[in-house]
């Protein structure tokens, strides 16, 4: 009897791996019936990740979007699954336990069947509450392994994580090969070991196509006993995204597996609608580089979906690096040469930083340190001269236990800066918070919604939810679309003139610089020219990878100029504020 291979369509991750935004509710409800008609999917990845947050950025209600989008799949008996980041929930930074618990209750009520939970560090302690809360809510708990390739990420290492999450009660295991750098034979051996030790556990494989190995990995894990394979479809398959259903279907069929038939008429309809969504406005936010594959990623292990933001960061520092090289009578570097240097620097520092799996947000942390190291080195400084607070939290153990040891240089640096390593449970650092958010809703006269779903959204994405309720988010999004339309009609915008400063820093003036490539959104309640500020005050917000990051004053002073305006794209190293 042939072994059956089942497919899951990654309709959410197809978009998230391609660009900034997801389809809106009316687009999703238009395409859903045709996905059902394809007749070949047992599962659909519908939400989680950045899905809910993106709806808020539109100025739309994510709860309405999730409920309406899931209805056709629930009615057809197709299982729906979401992605959540354990300690970080469905945002990019840690979430209190009571908010995490409410998330599973809300998502089950909205129609989500399966919670795929991963910890970017593979720390089983972060996964424990995800498994328990999912099961308490009546969901299927699928614990995901963050797959990467290093001397410490062996089959035995991953089996150690599997043993713990099965002990916690996980129903299924996912191999989350987020960068597509898992080696096919090793992944096959891992699945073989899981199936031998836990024959009743469902195994699902998720791989990105960027480096070019994921189809081979799919064949290996299928032969080893995997049950489900995650796939994408045109026009968003391949590139830095995922292998296409049609190719994977053909490979599995040729290998002797039983696979469902594809209704190609429905496939073409879904393909056509997806292209319409791209042509409508979503294509404005798809980085063309994400449509290309490159095996250069294998050495660094960076996920392909980072290429767009990484190239933006490189452009932000390229001129400064060449200026420093020129001042030393050294040859300037091309963009391609700088990319290769960055990849090599990632390879160099990744072991020193304890081999964190290069998945969001830890991939950004390692990439940022590598980039700032390059800036430091060309200016005659040492590596690790600039490490941001989030990266320090990872290095010190506040996000979980690193897979490998830190290099002595980093241990010594932490000691010199008076930083303490943390060995407790990361969740203990984040006390319950729902009561405070519940009071905020009462004070504003906002309903908590069915199953307290509105309360959950405020607690999970507080700033974005407030912007949605005030109407600011909708106005911001419409302006963004208008700007994109204008750019397209006029061609590429002219390069912005350098920002003019009132005075030179040599005359008692200090500047605060951006530490990342981001988009600036002002908050007039926080900062105005003439304000007196103290070191540590919140001055403004930058939006980086769909997350708002606070910009703090690094000194006492008076605001002389705000050097950026609403919606500006800020490069790493750009001046933001002028102080006296």
Predicted regions and their residues:
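N-terminal amphipathic alpha-helix/helix-capping segment at the start of soluble metabolic enzymes
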Residues: 1-18, 66-71
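Terminal or standalone catalytic/regulatory effector modules within metabolic enzymes
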Residues: 15, 36-54, 292-507
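Active-site beta->alpha loop and helix N-cap motifs at the rims of alpha/beta catalytic domains
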Residues: 33, 43, 48-161, 179-183
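Glycine-rich phosphate-binding active-site loops on the catalytic face of alpha/beta enzymes
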Residues: 117, 177, 224-243
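C-terminal helical cap(s) of enzyme catalytic domains, especially alpha/beta-barrels
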Residues: 237-262
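Acidic, low-complexity mobile loops and tails
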Residues: 494-541, 548-550, 556
